Amino acid sequence: PDLRVFAFAADNVQLLSRLGVWPAIAQARAWPYRRMQVWDAAGGEDLLFDADRFGRRELGYIVENGLLQDRLWAALPAAGVQLHCPARVEALEQDDDGVRLRLDDGRRLEAALAVAADGAESTLRQLAGIEVEKHDYHQRGVVDPAAGERAGVGKEILPRIPPRGR
């Protein structure tokens, strides 16, 4: 199972609302949180974010990765997005008039713009000749959304950054 979650701030929620997907996410499973305390297990400074400081009822919401993806995919057809799935880009041509893509199933697509949002090892990015620099920061985070409720402090999330290299 995919256990990843996102902590969405108010601006993120506004964007998802404008896209028309927030009501479906909130109705399914979005957990509000009022505080977020981040600490570094290696002894760095703690960070504390509190909704009261910003005059808000909640600081944001915790949303599961799978739920977010499901609701975003479901919203694409209503937004006029044409899906070409499953398919992979095999060739890219670009000039002043736009871009042309050839897919592995033989289809050809033309557009004013192609966005390389196909992952860390983006074929489209590579075909366009866009280089990247990669860095592994050797950091992971652990989020315990229930810790705040157990401690009697209300809805709080407590991410912990383990010591470097773990």
Segments predicted by a language model, with ranges:
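Pocket-edge structural micro-motifs
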Residues: A10, D40, A51, A146, ...
